[in-house]
A protein has these predicted regions:
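Conserved active-site tyrosine of GNAT-family acetyltransferases
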Residues: 41-46, 68, 118, 144, ...
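Surface-exposed interaction/gating patches
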Residues: 169-257, 264-270, 286
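Cationic, low-complexity basic patches in intrinsically disordered or flexible, solvent-exposed regions
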Residues: 3, 8, 16
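Short amphipathic beta-strand starts and helix->beta connectors
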Residues: 84-88, 161-164, 227-233
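Residue-level signal for short segments within beta-strands and strand-turn junctions
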Residues: 70-72, 85, 151, 229, ...
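An N-terminus-focused feature that recognizes amino-terminal "leader" regions
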Residues: 21-89, 95-105, 112, 116-120, ...
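Vicinal oxygen chelate
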Residues: 11-22, 27-36, 54-57, 87-183, 202-226, ...
Length: 335
């Protein structure tokens, strides 16, 4: 299905110029959150949630901190929920933040399985409810990370992990949608539609407020942002149990370079192109201050480890390998 074009405001690109662009982000690539308790984090996400630890590495900008990647059985882009190990106080919730992360499962039976499993583990879990036409199950991890399991209707392919503690038919299939809370919706919408080529898909009521859905690529829950405007709360303060950034998928390096050019032409401050070894990254902040990343689908996590043994040892990109002994000495054991 050919994706529909967004309607630009014209603030960043004139309409004639916009019509020349066919670039499309294809969905959520990964989401990176913050944990101050990495051992507990590993037990919750790899143990209770049954996700696969596909990469145990370090924050490339602060090698004293772990960077843990949880994903599906084949470590595919769009399934990665990742955590920085930062010893921070708890997040102060508020606006201008990524306020909820949704994880996709297949069917109401899966949600019932998860409700019972989470309750038995003493997790703060609510009842199954319908939101935006999809059944969902909101819950929080031990640090207050806000999560929701949603029924994606089995859309798209799935890659269960054979060694998971969760039966294959109930395993988490991937990310999305991602919920943002912003002070000024119009400014965020301008960037999402006129720069990032998303389209305003629909609206629905949630928690007594209006939620606006922005879709990318072919759409669907793996390719949506749900944005709520909140002009009452103060801005969130980043901390443990909060989210650091969300990344969006671009299929190859040619489009990745084109996105860099596009941000520069729109005069949006950005990080410039960064090689993260497992993928290429480009960071920038939308107008309300939330950190976005555009990331390539490849090369992937099997670049430096066999697929069969992903996550079993500390992996370091080549430029950090000479410092392995010092880095390992500075990390606390996870197991």
């Amino acid at each position: 299905m050919k994706p529909a074009k967004a309607k630009p405001s014209g603030r960043f690109f004139p309409k004639s110029r916009y019509e020349d662009y066919v670039m499309q982000l294809t969905g959520i690539h990964h989401l990176t959150a913050i944990s101050a308790r990495p051992k507990e984090n590993l037990s919750f996400y790899a143990g209770l949630l049954g996700m696969r630890l596909v990469k145990k590495t370090v924050n490339q900008d602060d090698v004293s901190a772990y960077h843990l990647f949880y994903a599906d059985g084949e470590a595919r882009p769009g399934t990665d929920l990742t955590f920085f190990d930062f010893p921070l106080p708890p997040e102060r919730r508020g606006t201008n933040s990524i306020s909820r992360t949704c994880l996709r499962v297949n069917g109401e039976q899966s949600l019932s399985f998860w409700r019972d499993r989470l309750k038995q583990a003493g997790v703060n879990v609510r009842d199954i409810v319908e939101v935006d036409g999809r059944l969902s199950l909101p819950f929080e991890d031990g640090e207050g990370q806000r999560l929701t399991l949603i029924d994606d209707g089995g859309a798209g392919s799935a890659s269960p992990w054979a060694k998971s503690s969760v039966p294959a038919e109930f395993q988490i299939r991937g990310l999305g949608p991602i919920v943002l809370t912003v002070h000024d919706l119009a400014r965020t919408e301008d960037v999402l539609t006129s720069v990032m080529n998303m389209r305003r898909a629909r609206e629905y009521a949630a928690h007594g407020a209006r939620m606006v859905v922005f879709a990318m690529g072919e759409g669907g829950p793996a390719a949506e942002l749900h944005v709520i405007e909140d002009r009452e709360q103060p801005a969130a303060r980043q901390g443990a149990g909060g989210v650091h950034h969300v990344a969006f998928r671009t299929p190859d390096e040619a489009q990745y370079h084109a996105w860099t050019q596009r941000l520069n032409e729109a005069r949006i401050r950005n990080s410039g192109e960064i090689d993260r070894f497992y993928f290429r990254s480009l960071y920038f902040r939308e107008p309300n201050g939330i950190l976005f990343e555009i990331a390539t689908d490849g090369p992937g996590f099997a670049t430096d480890e066999p697929m069969a043994t992903l996550g079993e040892k500390l992996a370091l990109p080549p430029f950090l390998e000479p410092r392995r002994a010092a880095i390992e000495a500075g990390l606390k054991p996870l197991g």
